[in-house]
């Protein structure tokens, strides 16, 4: 980056973000900043506070970083950050977004660099925000054709197909079997032994990435958690989202145990839940964006049930039942 790179890295690792910004901005004029410095400034601002002012300033950094070095990897990183952050800008009222410019930048970079997974993920998020479902599907289809067979890509694709009517249930089932084939199994020696709970109370675990304000899953689940018989059941609630809010805190008070597993890798999450010896685990995510289907493929409870959150199969052998009514099936 420049002679200050070592100091930049040290301050960033020590989370001295304000000092880092001061050092970068003091060292040269804005127009003389390198692409790497623009990228670092943009990221650092957001780590200090992700408010409207910092989002707009970071967008300016990322855009300038891309324009400064379009044909370098750090320039490409700036563009990925620029597109991803633009998605967040949609949440802020009274902000203008130049859609045409963003799409032109994307196409320009794709023409030069060819296929790049993270660039495709960024534009996929952008198309989702525009409600351009067909374009989302086109991006995901290109990723799958480039051998991106990770569960996130595959589940995103099958989820997107639920928004149009060109797939039959047979098509969904066929693709869900493909997901099943591509979802990895951990070695048995890596996993905590799966044990049945010896207590009289049944241990029920609910896994969701949607226990947040105004999400429909919370309205369905709250009634259950308010009314279950505490003499017969012990409830575990596992969150799979980044930040808790008031709704999350309210739900914690309704259950015996709660834990956020969003930052746990798949193996650690599986072993954490297995160690609790729950009897029945409910998947409230399915193929939605917050999914953790690999946990259920590797089995976290003797009985596993797909319930609210995603109203279809994702073809996993690990899911024993779908809890539904005649209107859903």
Task: For each feature predicted by the language model, list its residue ranges.
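Alpha-helical solenoid repeat scaffolds of the TPR/TPR-like class and their adjacent stem/linker regions
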Residues: 1-329
